[in-house]
Amino acid sequence: VPFGKRKEIGVVWKYENKELKNIKIKNINKKIEKYSINKSLVDFIDWFSTYNMVSPGLTLKMAIGNKDNYIKKIDSSLNKYKKNTKKYKLNNEQKKALEYLNLVNNKFDVSVLQGTTGSGKTLVYFERIKKIIDKNKQALVLLPEIFLTNEFKSRFEDFFGFEPAIWHSKITPKNKRIMWKGIIENKIRLIVGARSALLLPFKKLGLIVVDEEHDSSYKQVE
């Protein structure tokens, strides 16, 4: 859309039929056919903006990124599969936890997976993520600190056979564009990141895992 003397990426948020007197309305220059924001993301941005007392525009900017996401041609294929993955076996407690999570199926539910350090909680939600990905849906794993993403990267690769998409503030603009396109096209199905990853334009988000949910790093007070 025209914005002053420059062109910017805009989003049609809602329709209005009323006429505005003494105000010149500019036309949309071009519609980007390939990308659209689904209603669930629109509703989430509205809620997020109200809850955090920020303007929807600022929240939307975090979600859609800059115009390079739309005008630059980039291969959005990220997953690099390997043939040999490690085999893991669940114990009885892990099986019970996974059975409960699987019963939820496609319904909305909030579950707490609690256990001591080293009890195998990660393996349980890995198994749950695998079922979500097998259904052609996306899974998001949130981590409280950026430095934890590299530690988790190898563990994910050992289990799933491919590297997850890693999202946080230190990622280069080019890699962010690759991930953004892959996520909105549902080509990237496993995303690991800091809290800002919540605003990515997921096409078919089926599961969110908040690892170390009690960690104060998820909160921002300033």
Residue ranges and their predicted role:
Residues 1-194, 198-222:
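Accessory, non-ATPase domains that flank or precede helicase/AAA+ motor cores in DNA-metabolism machines
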